[in-house]
């Protein structure tokens, strides 16, 4: 039993929240009995009881309590059980990752149809306790869920069973009669699964405007309108009731069960999208279809031979009265052999004699040609798809080899290049991520990049506590880089244009001689983040301060300075925060020159003033040009108005001129 401190101490908030109602009930019971306990004693007793039950000694504690005197002990025992249940039956949500929360918003919760149609309670009344009167959400199967796929696997088995064994039992009488009980059990078990499958289909949701429909009435209406519903109904017609009249040796009465073939095809389609080896699955699927066709053709050949008569000619199955041809295994294997030779057209079979035999062989030849063409075409395309990446990679190697031979590259360098390509192929690093993800929307690209690079990005100090949008942009701009043994990632004094994050491999910080190692960097380390920020006052500027060399093959992530600055233009606050973090890191390492900061600040002030004057001058020039344009427009309008006035005055002056008046006076005098 756990040891408990018996001194009066303050219990935890969780214990207090559980004990609030319990203490009140206990006080009422104890006050009614005239007994008193201090709060410390009550708390100690309750904690003691809880620990007793947590350690698995609930039975012993219960026995000791019920054998004691007084209802108060019984009430404390019940209250302790209530407290223990509240602690252990309460499921706490896992602590979320704050880093992930910045990429994902609040999770949208799909509202059920009952909640959408629910009306608020009048007067704000609470619903009855225990959830009475509240409808439960209907069970709806999501077609993209794992449960639905598992059910497809389960229903595909009886469909495949019917397609393989019904025709075989119908053609080979011994197979049906010798194992009748087994077939009855399997048949009606398959029928039961067919019935359950109809119920599952009636509760399988579908998408409408991007949302899953969960209304059972709409689901049933949608299902009944499909062709699958009609085929499912036909596949469940109890045609085997004719057994009662014809006997049990007619399994062909159950051929309507073959109409459920769509479930088998759906299972194959979903498996092809889920498997990591789709090409292998396609080849296996094609072989399975071919075997089923050969199997059916063999059974039909034996049935035709039985109809014509065994041994009546050279084409049909030999006489079954002979012991070697009377066995069931020989009958099926002989028929399967004949069917394989006929459909594949690779062997000689006895020629047909009767017309119906000729007709059947002609149909078999046509089907065989189609099967052969299908197999050759599909297998050829599958093999080419399987080797497409290898062929493309080999073409790159061949072009590199030809170039190195043309440029007369040294053998040592040529060997290093070939080994680098071999390493890429052996470790499956030849995939072009941009080419693979180019068809995805930006949101899914970001999600994939976050899942791939999240652990790596979380380790970089300057990128911690950045806003989510900036981190998404940076994650999308990370580029993989692979270095060979002995390659220099950076050298002392080089201008820093990238920062690197080690995903896999080991890098050594070496001296100028390239041999002496100061420190070894391993997975998760990063370097070069300060040089791409252009921290003002840095003694090293944006140049590298160390020589870093790859010990073996190293897989790194690279973030270029141009990509970072392009991203930070949209996030000025984040840019200032990153520069401040970088400055603090440099100050800790005593790599900040205050005089240089002041000088650069003065230079920056002068530059800002010059930029301000230039912008002001540009503004003045723009305003002057606008005013000049307005002045020119007003002058044009004024000239047009003056011209109009002159023309009007000219017309009026011409109408009342002095010459006209003198002529009128002369005419009057005459």
Swiss-Prot record:
Biased composition (Polar residues): 1-15
Ranges per topology, Extracellular: 175-184, 250-254, 305-327
The keyword Cell wall biogenesis/degradation appears for this protein: no
Alphabetized UniProt keyword annotations: Cell membrane, Coiled coil, Ion channel, Ion transport, Ligand-gated ion channel, Membrane, Sensory transduction, Transmembrane, Transmembrane helix, Transport
Record-linked SMART domains: cNMP
Chain spans, region Selectivity filter: 345-348
Spans annotated as C-linker: 388-464
Region forming the signal peptide: none
SUPFAM superfamilies: cAMP-binding domain-like, Voltage-gated potassium channels
Tissue specificity field: Expressed in circumvallate papillae of the tongue.
Region (Disordered): 1-25, 111-138, 644-670
Topology relative to the membrane: Multi-pass membrane protein
Residues under site feature: Central gate: 372, 376
Basic and acidic residues: bias regions: 129-138, 657-670
Gene Ontology terms describing biological process: inorganic cation import across plasma membrane; membrane depolarization; monoatomic cation transmembrane transport; monoatomic cation transport; monoatomic ion transmembrane transport; response to cAMP; response to magnesium ion; retina development in camera-type eye
Coiled-coil regions listed in the entry: 606-659
Cytoplasmic side: 1-152, 206-230, 274-280, 388-670
Chain segments carrying region Cyclic nucleotide-binding domain: 468-588
Region (Ion conduction pathway): 278-386
Membrane spanning stretches: 153-174, 185-205, 231-249, 255-273, 281-304, 328-362, 363-387
Compartments, record wording: Cell membrane
Main location: membrane
Catalytic activity, as annotated: Ca(2+)(in) = Ca(2+)(out); Na(+)(in) = Na(+)(out); K(+)(in) = K(+)(out); NH4(+)(in) = NH4(+)(out)
Described purpose of this protein according to its UniProt entry: Pore-forming subunit of the cone cyclic nucleotide-gated channel. Mediates cone photoresponses at bright light converting transient changes in intracellular cGMP levels into electrical signals. In the dark, cGMP levels are high and keep the channel open enabling a steady inward current carried by Na(+) and Ca(2+) ions that leads to membrane depolarization and neurotransmitter release from synaptic terminals.
Protein name: Cyclic nucleotide-gated channel alpha-3
Organism: Rattus norvegicus
Native organism taxonomy: Eukaryota, Metazoa, Chordata, Craniata, Vertebrata
């Amino acid at each position: 039993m756990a040891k408990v401190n018996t001194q009066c101490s303050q219990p935890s908030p969780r214990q207090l929240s559980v004990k609030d109602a319990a203490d009140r009930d206990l006080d009422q019971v104890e006050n009614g009995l005239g007994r008193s306990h201090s709060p410390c004693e009550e708390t100690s007793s309750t904690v003691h009881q809880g620990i007793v039950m947590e350690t698995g000694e609930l039975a012993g504690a219960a026995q000791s309590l019920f054998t004691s005197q007084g209802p108060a002990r019984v009430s404390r025992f019940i209250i302790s059980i209530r407290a223990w249940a509240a602690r252990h039956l309460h499921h706490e949500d896992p602590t979320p990752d704050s880093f992930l929360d910045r990429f994902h918003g609040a999770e949208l919760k799909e509202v059920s149809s009952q909640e959408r149609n629910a009306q608020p309670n009048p007067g704000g009344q609470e619903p009855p306790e225990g959830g009475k009167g509240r409808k439960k959400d209907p069970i709806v199967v999501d077609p993209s869920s794992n449960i639905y796929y598992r059910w497809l696997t389960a229903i595909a088995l009886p469909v495949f069973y019917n397609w393989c064994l019904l025709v075989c039992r119908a053609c080979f009488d011994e197979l049906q009669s010798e194992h009748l009980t087994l077939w009855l059990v399997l048949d009606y078990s398959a029928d039961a699964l067919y019935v359950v499958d109809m119920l599952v289909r009636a509760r399988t949701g579908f998408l409408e405007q991007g949302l899953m429909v969960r209304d059972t009435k709409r689901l049933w209406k949608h299902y009944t309108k499909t062709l699958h519903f009609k085929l499912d109904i036909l596949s469940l017609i109890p045609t085997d009731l004719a057994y009662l009249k014809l006997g049990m040796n007619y399994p062909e009465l159950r051929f309507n069960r073959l109409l459920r073939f769509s479930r088998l095809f759906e299972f194959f389609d979903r498996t092809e999208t889920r498997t990591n080896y789709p090409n292998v699955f396609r080849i296996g699927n094609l072989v399975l279809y071919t075997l089923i066709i050969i199997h059916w053709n063999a059974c039909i050949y034996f049935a035709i031979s039985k109809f014509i008569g065994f041994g009546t000619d050279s084409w049909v199955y030999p006489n079954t009265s002979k012991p070697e041809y009377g066995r069931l295994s020989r009958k099926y294997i002989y028929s399967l052999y004949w069917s394989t030779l006929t459909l594949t057209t690779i062997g000689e079979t006895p020629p047909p004699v009767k017309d119906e035999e000729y007709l059947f062989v002609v149909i078999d030849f046509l089907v065989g040609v189609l099967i052969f063409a299908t197999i050759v075409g599909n297998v050829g395309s599958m093999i080419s798809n399987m080797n497409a990446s290898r062929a493309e990679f080999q073409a790159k190697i061949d072009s590199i080899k030809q170039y190195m031979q043309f440029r007369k590259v040294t053998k040592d360098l040529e060997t290093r290049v070939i080994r680098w390509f071999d390493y890429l192929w052996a470790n499956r690093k030849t995939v072009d991520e941009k080419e693979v993800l180019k068809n995805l929307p930006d949101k899914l690209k970001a999600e994939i990049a976050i899942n791939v690079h999240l652990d790596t990005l979380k380790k970089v100090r300057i990128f911690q506590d950045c806003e989510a949008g900036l981190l998404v942009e940076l994650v999308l701009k990370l580029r993989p880089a692979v270095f060979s043994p002995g390659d220099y990632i950076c050298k002392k004094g080089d201008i820093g244009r990238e920062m690197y994050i080690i995903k896999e491999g080991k890098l050594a910080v070496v001296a100028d001689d390239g041999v002496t190692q100061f420190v070894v960097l391993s997975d998760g380390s990063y370097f070069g983040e300060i040089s791409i920020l252009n921290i003002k006052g840095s003694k090293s500027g944006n140049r590298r301060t160390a020589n870093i060399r790859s010990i073996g093959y190293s897989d790194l992530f690279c973030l270029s300075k141009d990509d970072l600055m392009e991203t930070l233009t949209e996030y000025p606050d984040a840019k200032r925060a990153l520069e401040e973090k970088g400055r603090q890191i440099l100050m800790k390492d005593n790599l900040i020159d205050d005089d240089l900061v002041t000088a650069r600040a003065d230079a920056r002030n002068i530059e800002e003033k010059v930029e301000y004057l230039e912008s002001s001058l540009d503004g003045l020039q723009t305003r002057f040009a606008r005013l000049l344009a307005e002045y020119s427009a007003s002058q044009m309008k004024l000239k047009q108005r003056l011209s109009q006035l002159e023309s009007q005055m000219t017309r009026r002056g011409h109408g009342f001129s002095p010459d006209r008046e003198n002529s009128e006076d002369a005419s009057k005098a005459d």
